[in-house]
Amino acid sequence: MALINIKAPENIILKPHITVFGVGGAGSNAVNNMIGANLQGANFVVANTDAQSLEYSRCENKIQLGVSTTRGLGAGAAPEVGAAAAQESENEIRNYLENSNMVFITAGMGGGTGTGSAPVIARIAKELGILTVGVVTKPFHFEGGHRMKTADKGIIDLQQFVDTLIVIPNQNLFRIANEQTTFADAFKMADDVLHAGVRGVTDLMIMPGLINLDFADIKAVMSEMGKAMMGTGEASGEDRATKAAESAISNPLLDHSSMCGARGVLINITGGPDMTLFEVDNAANRIREEVNNKDANIIFGSTFNPELKGIIRVSVVATGIDADKIPLYKPVNSSATDLSIEEDEDTKLRAQSTQGDQPVHIEEIPNFNSYSNDEAEIADSLDQAPNSTNDDMEPRVSLTNDAGETPKSSFFVRMWGSLRTQNNNQIPERKNVVVGMPDEETKESDIHDIPAFLRKKRD
């Protein structure tokens, strides 16, 4: 009789894998602070071109970027060197990212390693189908314009590959720091934004609660959403829920300090066993009012934490903040003129004709090339025609600038400036202006206002 051995299946725990990837010196420091805060639910990886910096990292998973490219000496503030180093170590980066469902890439923009390597790592993550979130800092103003331009270029490169991007200008640290704040404590404040964002996501999936969220909910809010903001607030005592929510939605460190109009919002309200239903409702409604977008995808979760007895913590991730911001067209040298759209064409031309060498833009310019030579000579001589001395006539427009010099202007403007306007500066019909000849509907009294040589032409 054959014996059948039946083994119990292995207890396989299926849960999303979240990786925090620190790049460069600033990214490595952020990971060190998160490890020191004992953040649970995430794996940590640091990557740097500086071998000495890697030695001091608390993280176990380390990548020496570009061994042949930099020889462990850093990128020298050159983003192209940082990018080349990351490309050299692409296989190692890919190995650490595999099996991850979500990755937070943190770096400081403006240097060499973070600015150049972060976009390469983000590209690899996207190729692996990983939900990718970038959390980066921008330089202080005292670091100079060159470093700021480098940072802006790096942010543009990174944004191509991340689903959501959070930018923290270091200059905003002055909003919350005082004269006693140490340099290390100030940077830790910036790192806390990343810490709070990762904790807000992991708590929703691993902490017990009445309303738990799965990874699909997280992905629905953060996938391909562009610029975002994160905020966390804690409060106790009276109105603690509302106060915590208001603190979460007004993070002074972020580049985008308002979540108004966000397309996706992730809300996590955490408290002790004393948290009430009305408090959860007050906090959630306060955030919804701030978003002020009826079409926003708002995903809400609430969890319990015994350590927060008497305290309510509200974490918010608002995404798609810049979805409706389309760059407006601004004409060249538009600051030189201040013309409203309601002004008539005559007013526009007179204002623009006094702007010196500023270009003149009009809706319709006649095709003077179609005129005969005689007509062109007649039209060209209009600026030499004498003006009437009647008091009710508009004075000739001055075509001299402040220096007394005659600026260069188009033929159309010179011609228009020499013509006299009637009826409260109303523009005459263009067919009378172009060739200077009245039509059959012209009144007999108006003929005397036409120069004699034109009157003969008409006769």
Swiss-Prot record:
The keyword GTP-binding appears for this protein: yes
Pfam families: FtsZ_C, Tubulin
Domain of life: Bacteria
UniProt GO molecular function: GTP binding; GTPase activity
Renumbered residue ranges of the record's region Disordered: 383-405, 427-459
Predominant localisation class: cytoplasm
Record CDD domains: FtsZ_type1 (cd02201)
Subcellular location: Cytoplasm
GO biological process per UniProt: division septum assembly; FtsZ-dependent cytokinesis; protein polymerization
Cellular component, GO annotation: cell division site; cytoplasm
Family annotation (InterPro entries): Cell_div_FtsZ (IPR000158), Cell_div_FtsZ_CS (IPR020805), FtsZ/CetZ (IPR045061), FtsZ_C (IPR024757), Tub_FtsZ_C (IPR008280), Tubulin/FtsZ-like_C (IPR037103), Tubulin/FtsZ_2-layer-sand-dom (IPR018316), Tubulin/FtsZ_GTPase_sf (IPR036525)
Ligand binding (GTP): G25, A26, G27, S28, N29, G112, T113, G114, E143, R147, D191
Protein keywords: Cell cycle, Cell division, Cytoplasm, GTP-binding, Nucleotide-binding, Septation
Family to which this protein belongs: Belongs to the FtsZ family.
Oligomeric and partner information: Homodimer. Polymerizes to form a dynamic ring structure in a strictly GTP-dependent manner. Interacts directly with several other division proteins.
Function noted in UniProt: Essential cell division protein that forms a contractile ring structure (Z ring) at the future cell division site. The regulation of the ring assembly controls the timing and the location of cell division. One of the functions of the FtsZ ring is to recruit other cell division proteins to the septum to produce a new cell wall between the dividing cells. Binds GTP and shows GTPase activity.
Protein name: Cell division protein FtsZ
